Amino acid sequence: MATDPRTMLVTCALPYANGSIHLGHMLEHIQADIWVRYQRMRGHQVHFVCADDAHGTPIMLKAQQLGITPEEMIAAVSKEHQADFAGFNISFDNYHSTHSDENRELAELIYGRLQAGGKIKSRTISQLFDPEKSMFLPDRFVKGTCPKCKSPEQYGDNCDSCGATYSPTELIDPKSAVSGATPVMKDSEHFFFDLPQFEKWLAEWVRGSGAIQEEMANKMQEWFESGLQQWDITRDAPYFGFEIPGAPGKYFYVWLDAPIGYMASFKNLCNKRRDIDFDSYWKADSEAELYHFIGKDIAYFHCLFWPSMLEGAGFRKPTKVNVHGYVTVNGAKMSKSKGTFIKASTYLNHLDPECLRYYYAAKLNSRIDDLDLNLDDFVARVNADVVNKLVNLASRNAGFIAKRFDGKLAATCAEPELYAEFANSRTAIAEAYESREFSRAIREIMALADKANRYVDDKAPWVIAKQEGADAELQAVCSVGINLFRVLMAYLKPVMPLLAERAEAFLAETLSWDGIEMPLVDHTVAPFKALFSRIEPAKIEAMIDASKEDLAKEQAPKASGPLVDDPISETISYDDFAKIDLRVALIKKAEAVPEADKLLKLQLDIGGETRQVFAGIKSAYNPEDLEGKLTVMVANLAPRKMRFGMSEGMVLAAGPGGKDLWILEPQEGAKPGMRVK
C-alpha cells in the first residue's frame, strides 16, 4: 500500500450525446482507466467520473429529425455509451449527464458568482439568422464559399481546404445548413465571459502550477500573444440547454455547462454515496488532486476558459490537464468508406477489448502525439507479446506443476536473485505509469518477459521432466517460471484487468503491487486454463467489413414522405367506415372568422340543404378563392357548438397544416349532395 495515500478525482472528456463511441474516443478512456487502475493498486483513493455532454443545437436538430424529444434521444445515447465503456472495462465510479439537476444548479451558481464579480458583460451582436426556421445559426450550421481560397461548401468558422478561420458573416453566398435558406443578419443581446480579466492570472497559472504539459503551455503562449477575447456564453432560443437566469429566451452555450458536468457527475456520486464530501474536493484550498484527460481538440476550452471560470467562481483548479493526440488508422485519418472508422460496439462484436487496451498502452506516452492504430502491427504485437511471451510463459510451466506436483509450487524460490530483479523493477515501472509513459512501462515489462522466457528455455523443463530423479529440479524451475509470470501480470493488471482476473484464478491469489515483493512458495495453483486467444486476421477483416456496413446503413436513403410523418392508423372494419356519410358539397359562401386565427366560415350546399361549417383552412386559402368550388364533407358528424356559431359537419382536406393544406375537389360532373363511397 502507498505510504502516503492520495485523494484524487479523475475525469475524461464528456462524449457528445448525438453519436456512437468510436476507437478515437476509446484512446482517452483507456488511457485514463489504466492510470486510475494503477493508482488504485497503489492504495490511493480515486473517484473516476464522466458524463454525456447532452446540450446544444446539434442534439436539438437531430432529435427533431428522429421525431423524438431531445430528452428521449440523450437517454438512448447514454445507455449506448455506457454499454460501450463497460465493454472496454472502463472503471467509472459514476457516469452522468450534463442535462441534470446537479449541472443546472452548479451552472447557475458559477454564472451567478461570475456575474456578481463583474466577470460577465453584455452587448448586442449581429448574427446570421435562418428566416425559415426562425433560429440563429451557430458557425457549423452555416455553409458557403471560403472567403480566402473560394472553396465551396465550407463551414462558417473555418475552411477544410485551406485551413483559414473566419466569421460566418465573411462566407460568400452563405446558406443555412438546416433549411438551405439564405440567412439574414439579426441583432441579439448576448452575455460574455470576460476572459481578458484573467490574462495575467492565467499566464502565471500556466507556467507556475505544473498543470499544463510543456507543449500545451507553449501553445497557450501563442494564444496570449494574439490576445484573449471575451467569450460568448449565450445562445438564443430555440436551443436545448439551460436557460440563463433572468434572461428569458437566452441559454447557456453548451461549452459553459459541459465542463461543469465534471462537477455535476461528482456531485451526483456524492449524493449516492453520502460518504464523500463534495466541497472537500472542489473548494479553493482543496488538498485533493484533480486530473482531466482530454484530446487536443478541446484544449482551448480546458486550458483557458475552464480554469478561469473556476478561479472567478471561487473553486479549485485542476492539478493536471492531460492532453493527448488523435487516433489514426493505418497511417491515415479514420475513414468510414475504408471501414477504419470503427465504432466501439463494432470492435466489441469481433475482438477482445483487452487487445486494444494493450496496443494503446504500448504506444501511449505523456506527450500530445497522435497514435496510429496500424492493424497489421496490432495483430502482430498482441500475438507476439501477450500470447507468445506472456501467456505462453505460464502455460509451458503450469502443465508440469499440475501433472507432476498436484499444482503445488516449490517450498523455496530457486532463483532469488532473478526474482528480486523482477520485483525490484516495479520502481521504474511505477514511475512510468505515474507519468503516463505507458509505452515505457510496456517495454520494461516485455523486456522482463523475454528474460523470463530465456530462463525457461535455458532450463528446458521438458528435458528435465524426462530425467529420473529430477522431480525437485523440475518443480523448482517451473515454480520460478510461474512466479515470474505472476510478477509480469501484476505489472500489467492496470492495462489488462480481465486477463489479470483469469491469471488470479490460476494463481489462486489476488495480484497486488506490493504483494509481489516475495515469491509464492509452498502454494497451490489451480489447473491451468487458456488465458488468452490469438487475434486471427480474419476477425480484423470482418470488423472492417462490418464498419463499412455501418456506413451503408448511415447512407441509406432515409424514409420520407407523408407516411413517415403521419403513419396509417389502426385498421377498421367495413362496417365502421360505412357509418361515415361523405357528400359532395358546393361552397356557396366563405368568410374569415375575425376572432379565430385558423378558421373560415363556409356555407355549403349539399343538394337541397345548406350547412354551416367552420374549417381550419384559413392559413391556406383566401375566402373568395373558395366560393363556387366543389368539395367533400362529412355530413353525418354531430353538430358542434363553437363560440362563433354551430358547425354542422366537417370539410375534408389533405396536408400537414399551415400553407400546406388542400381541400378535396371532386371532378367535373359531380353534383352537390352525391354520396362519396
From Swiss-Prot:
A Pfam short name: tRNA-synt_1g
UniProt KW keywords: Aminoacyl-tRNA synthetase, ATP-binding, Cytoplasm, Ligase, Metal-binding, Nucleotide-binding, Protein biosynthesis, RNA-binding, tRNA-binding, Zinc
Motif ('HIGH' region): 15-25
Residue window of motif 'KMSKS' region: 333-337
UniProt GO cellular component terms: cytosol
Binding site for ATP: K336
Cofactor: record remark: Binds 1 zinc ion per subunit.
GO biological process: one example: methionyl-tRNA aminoacylation
Documented EC number(s): 6.1.1.10
Cited PROSITE patterns: AA_TRNA_LIGASE_I, TRBD
Subcellular location per the Swiss-Prot or TrEMBL entry: Cytoplasm
Cofactors: Zn(2+)
Coiled-coil region: none
Reactions this protein catalyses: tRNA(Met) + L-methionine + ATP = L-methionyl-tRNA(Met) + AMP + diphosphate
Residues reported in the UniProt entry to bind Zn(2+): C146, C149, C159, C162
Single GO term (MF): methionine-tRNA ligase activity
SUPFAM superfamilies: Anticodon-binding domain of a subclass of class I aminoacyl-tRNA synthetases (SSF47323), Methionyl-tRNA synthetase (MetRS), Zn-domain (SSF57770), Nucleic acid-binding proteins (SSF50249), Nucleotidylyl transferase (SSF52374)
Record-annotated tRNA-binding domain positions: 576-677
Entry similarity comment: Belongs to the class-I aminoacyl-tRNA synthetase family. MetG type 1 subfamily.
Subunit relationships: Homodimer.
Function comment: Is required not only for elongation of protein synthesis but also for the initiation of all mRNA translation through initiator tRNA(fMet) aminoacylation.
Protein name, per record: Methionine--tRNA ligase
Organism name: Aeromonas hydrophila subsp. hydrophila (strain ATCC 7966 / DSM 30187 / BCRC 13018 / CCUG 14551 / JCM 1027 / KCTC 2358 / NCIMB 9240 / NCTC 8049)
